Design a protein with these regions (language model features):
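Solvent-exposed, low-complexity segments and loops of surface/extracellular structural proteins
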Residues: 1-338
Length: 338
C-alpha cells in the first residue's frame, strides 16, 4: 500500500497485530511523518520502502530513523551541499541511497574527499554514485593530486579554471578521467627542454592550455635560433589546437647573425615570429641575411649588434637594410670598388 493507505489502516486498527507494508516516494512519506513519544507515527508499519524521490541530508536521516525503514529495498536520491554530505557520511552510506547529487561545483580538495566517500560506499557493498563537478585553480588541483593522480577520477567533470603549472603537473590534470579541456584555461610554465620534449607535445597542445611560459627564455634568459624556430612552430600548433590566435608561447631568442639568418633563409622568414623578442648578439651575415633578420616580427634592433659583409653592389642596392637599422654595427665591403 502507499503511505496514505498505510496511515489509514494503522489509525483504524483497534486491537491485534496488523502487517502493513508501505511502498511510496520519499516526499509522500515525509509529508505524513510526525514525531510521537518514543519515535515516529510510522514505526508501527511492518516495513517502509522508499521507492523514489530526492531529499536533502536532514530528510534522509529522518527517513532512516523510522524503525520500519527497509534500506535494502529502498532507492532514492540525496541532493545537498558538499558540506552537508561530508558532514553526515553515516546517512549517505546507506543501502537505500542510490544516488548523491552535490549542489554546485566544489574545489579540488573537497572533490578528493567526495571521491573517497564514493569509494567507501562501494566498499560497503552499496552502489551509490556521488555526482559532483570540480572547478578550481590548476595549482590547487595539482596539490590535490599529489601522491595520488587518481584522486579526482570520481568527479563528473574537472575544470582547471586558471593558474600556472609545470608540464608534468599539466599532464596529471589532463589525466583525470573526466577532465574538461574545452572549459579549462590555464598556463604551463617550464623549461625549454621540458616544453620541447617530443613526448610532452600532446600535453602542451591541449585545448585547456591558454599559454606557455618558457622559464629559462624569459627575462634575461633566452633560447638559440634553432630552439626558437621549434617553439614558434609549437606556438602555431597551440593556436590551432585551442582555436585561439592569441594563445602564446612566451620566449626570447638570442643568437649570432649567421645562426639566425640560417633559420630565416629562403621562404622561412616567419620562423621566429613566435618569439617575444629576437636579439642578434654579434656575428656576420650578408645583405640578404640582414634583410631576413630585420623582417622578423620579433626583431629587436635597439638591442642587437652585428656586421654585414657583402659586395658594394649589394650594399648600395639596399641602403635601408645596411644603414637605417640600429642593429647593424659594422658594414664590410667585399672586394675592391671602382
Amino acid at each position: 500500500v502507499n503511505i496514505a493507505q498505510g496511515i489509514q489502516i494503522i489509525d483504524g486498527a483497534n486491537t491485534g497485530t496488523i502487517d502493513v507494508n508501505v511502498d511510496d516516494s520519499a516526499g509522500a512519506i515525509l509529508s505524513e511523518l510526525t514525531e510521537v513519544s518514543g519515535g515516529t507515527n510510522l514505526d508501527e508499519l511492518t516495513s517502509l520502502t522508499v521507492t523514489a524521490g530526492v531529499v536533502d541530508i536532514s530528510s534522509a536521516a529522518d527517513l532512516q530513523d523510522i524503525t520500519s525503514y527497509d534500506a535494502s529495498n529502498s532507492s532514492y536520491t540525496i541532493s545537498d551541499t558538499a558540506g552537508a554530505i561530508l558532514g553526515d557520511t553515516g546517512t549517505v552510506i546507506d543501502d537505500g541511497v542510490s544516488t548523491i547529487n552535490v549542489n554546485g561545483p566544489v574545489g579540488a580538495g573537497v572533490g578528493v574527499q567526495l571521491g573517497a566517500l564514493e569509494d567507501a560506499s562501494f566498499e560497503t557493498g552499496y552502489s551509490a554514485d556521488i555526482n559532483f563537478n570540480v572547478v578550481d585553480d590548476a595549482n590547487d588541483i595539482t596539490a590535490a593530486l599529489t601522491g595520488d593522480t587518481t584522486g579526482l577520477d570520481n568527479a563528473a567533470s574537472l575544470v582547471a579554471s586558471s593558474g600556472t603549472v609545470t608540464v608534468t603537473e599539466a599532464s596529471d590534470i589532463q589525466g583525470v578521467a573526466e577532465y574538461d579541456s574545452g572549459a579549462s584555461s590555464y598556463t604551463i610554465s617550464d623549461s625549454a627542454d621540458a616544453v620541447l620534449t617530443a613526448s610532452n607535445e600532446s600535453t602542451i597542445l591541449n585545448d585547456g592550455v591558454s599559454g606557455v611560459v618558457v622559464t629559462d627564455a624569459t627575462g634575461a634568459g633566452y633560447v638559440d635560433a634553432s630552439d626558437g624556430e621549434a617553439l614558434s612552430e609549437l606556438e602555431g600548433l597551440l593556436q590551432t589546437a585551442t582555436n585561439d590566435s592569441a594563445a602564446d608561447i612566451e620566449f626570447r631568442v638570442e643568437d649570432d647573425a649567421a645562426a639566425i639568418a640560417a633559420v630565416l633563409s629562403g621562404n622561412n622568414g616567419g620562423a621566429l615570429d613566435g618569439a617575444n623578442d629576437l636579439e642578434v648578439t654579434g656575428g656576420t651575415t650578408t645583405m640578404v641575411g640582414a634583410a631576413d633578420i630585420q623582417s622578423s616580427g620579433a626583431y629587436d634592433a635597439a638591442n642587437s649588434s652585428y656586421t654585414i659583409t657583402d659586395t658594394a653592389g649589394a650594399i648600395l642596392g639596399d641602403t635601408a637594410t645596411a644603414i637605417d637599422d640600429d642593429g647593424v654595427s659594422h658594414i664590410i665591403v667585399d672586394g675592391k670598388v671602382g
